[in-house]
Amino acid sequence: MSRCLIIINPVSGGGAARRYALDLQWKLSTLFETIEVKFTRGEGDATRFAKNACERGFDAVFCMGGDGTVNETVNGIAQGGFSCTFGFIPVGTVNDMSRALGIPQNPTQAIRRIDINETRTIDIGRCNDRYFCNNIAAGVIPKVVDEVTPKEKSILGPLAYFLRA
């Protein structure tokens, strides 16, 4: 029996992730026999959910959110032994990894493009006890990312990071 976990950050994209959740669930239900959906409520949830799914033998973990949700999910899969296929739908402010991979920024288009038979291998790095898949930053960048509020991201979009710097 093929199983897939969907992790949704309901505040990503000003609540856009919640709006597209059913579309993603429907699409993945055509590819997997069992779908489980979990909504994050705070920091660390996506990591915990992904790790648990891998440990329970799920075939895939998809997340819907921004770069932070993607990073947390990748960390959970890594901690779970890299045993799951990973997919994501970009619904954040910047969506850096999806841009690098050529994934459509429009969630509907990204969902339509999901094909479990067309996967790619991506490199995963590790720094201390954290994993990363797209970039790693030091100095002012992580400080700025931490300081930008969800309200600022919602109102200003990517400009919020520039103004905080």
Regions picked out by a protein language model, each given a short descriptive name:
Residues P10, M64-G66, V91:
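Glycine-rich beta-strand-to-loop/alpha-helix junction loops that act as flexible
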Residues S12, V70, T93:
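Short, glycine/acidic-enriched loop or turn micro-motifs at the edges of active sites
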Residues M1-V61, N75-G76:
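ATP/NTP phosphate-donor binding region
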Residues G42, G65-G66, A137:
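Helix N-cap/beta->alpha junction signal
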Residues A46, G68-T73, D96:
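Short glycine/serine/threonine-rich phosphate/pyrophosphate-binding segments
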